[in-house]
Amino acid sequence: MLGASALAVVQVASTVNDLFQILFFGIGNASAVMIGNELGRRNEDKAYSYAVVFLKMTFAINLVMSVALFLSRGMVINIYDFDQETNIMLANTLAVYAIYMLPKMFTYVLFCGILRSGGDTRFCMLLDLLGVWVIGVPLAFLGVLVFHLPLHIIVAMVFFEEWVKLYF
């Protein structure tokens, strides 16, 4: 069973991860505004070219930020006064966050920035809802209560929904 150490690790990992992902929230919002403006002007070709540019930019920045998050694990661990076991748990969890930043931020820009700006909000909502309630929550339940897996594996299982969303 996971305890206070796991809760601390998830809190720290989520906060650090958010620092690396904030750039993508800006990219997603910028793409929504720029693409939405072009679609409103009935300039679909320019909106499409913006979408392609934003996706390429997201992919390139995503690689850099994922590697930076992975490499910063040691610095993050040094900030906190955790025991050795918790430090290992934090390092492993940050590694999972770094790996899953790739599909997560790509789908964020794709869904929140590009598809929603084009009016495809129902598809985005359904994919988000199904991802969380059909994939993420059941896998977390199985990982914690049935299989008693380590924290980083449970986090990876929950984030698996991002690969599924990327497929659609």
Q: Could you say what each language-model-derived stretch is?
A:
Residues 35-101, 143-168:
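Short alpha-helical transmembrane segments in multi-pass integral membrane proteins
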Residues 25-28, 97-117, 123-132, 139, ...:
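Short runs within selected transmembrane alpha-helices of multi-pass transporters and secretion channels
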